[in-house]
Amino acid sequence: MRKKLLSILLVLSLMLALVPAAFAADIASGTCGAEGDGSNVTWTLDETGLLTISGTGKIASGTGGSIWSDKPVLAVDIRSGVTGVGKDAFYGCDDLQVISLPDTVTQLDDNALGNCPALSDILVDAKNPAYKSVDGALYSKDGTVLVKGPANAETFVVPDGVATIGDYAFFGAKYLTSIYFPEGSLTTIGAMAFEFCEGLTELLLPAGVTEIGMYAFAHCSGLRSVDLPVSLKHVSDMAFLSAGTMDAGIADINYAGSEQQWNAIAFEDGVLGWMHKNFNTEQHTFGAWVTDGTRSCAQGVTMARSCGNDGCDLVQTVELPALGHIWDSGTLLAAPDGVRCGIVEHTCGRCNGTGYEVLDPEIWAYEQFGDVDPTLWSYEGIQFCVMMGFMSGMDTHVFAPRGVTTRA
């Protein structure tokens, strides 16, 4: 059924379902509970690409990828009662755009949402005690840990107050070209946090960062320049493995401290040892971000911050697009029939705004009367009058009386 959208904002949205729930049929189902939970956790996938997971217990870990990686999953709705998401549970769901977590999910295992390149939004129930969502990204409830960023983002600004970029936070975010870190709060870059972010070309790690986890920037093939602060104390195994390419690797490591201080850093491997290093480089110290508005479903913002060092005129400017509505599958207010359009009311999962959708009238199959010539100009009018109850045939195949219907 072709659908028309009344709200222009609907064009900008990511739909949780492509047709109203009343019209969507399930195409697959099964169980997905972790060991001990077994059949207590069930799933259904409907024809719109909406995967609904319900029950009690934890979703099982993936084995070499998600059990749904070969299915057309566009959105995931995890219902209250599910308590956790296993390792690699949704790994490799290439088309997944939106996932919603209920109040009861308090555990996400390693890379549960890994390698989902289209993922733009993670929504969290406001009553969840462990997690919260801000602009589509997933954070610990207190906002100090960035658990998972939007995988399809090109630019991301880590907000003030974040102390840790979690393990796998941007793993495989192949579209990411720019990442901006907060001043004064960030201390730790987790394991595999930016692995396979091939679009990154530059890193400016702020003062205060003390630890870089294993494989944190491994296979970032586009990386050319890295600024490291004097606060750095520990760099884990293979943190920059295969960063840059064989022909054009990282050109410069700019370190704010002395060579003696560099040698005191605990490196677990020699990946950075052969790279060219510039010591005692001046480290940028940025002020607070200034924005020209509030980012919302319908409105983007421009952000800017300046380096406060004497003689430095560097200004970082970032344009962030509107977030876009995330519509639910909708409530059918009026069903379409052979004459009237139907109306579906959608609610945005992010801003609680309302949008309306118009469904075209049903194309009813005309009943075939043996005594009414389908080529007559009056044929469709007769069928319409029968269907609307204005008149009826003698039986299901005879309209009667016989004769030619003439124009008035």
Please annotate each region the language model reported.
Residues V157, G161, E282-W364:
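Extracellular modular ligand-binding repeats in secreted and cell-surface proteins
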Residues L376-M388, D395-A408:
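Short, solvent-exposed alpha-helical surface patches in non-cytosolic proteins
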Residues K87-A89, D110-A112, D167-A169, G190-A193, ...:
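Consensus positions within tandem repeat domains that build extended binding/scaffold surfaces
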Residues L16-A28:
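Sec-dependent signal peptide cleavage junction
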Residues L9-A17:
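Bacterial N-terminal signal peptides
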Residues D46-T56, K71-G84, D94-Q107, C116-G136, ...:
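Structural signature of tandem-repeat unit edges
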Residues A25-D94, A169-G172, F196, A218, ...:
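Surface-exposed repetitive/solenoidal architectures
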Residues L14, W43, I53, V76, ...:
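Extracellular/surface recognition and adhesion modules
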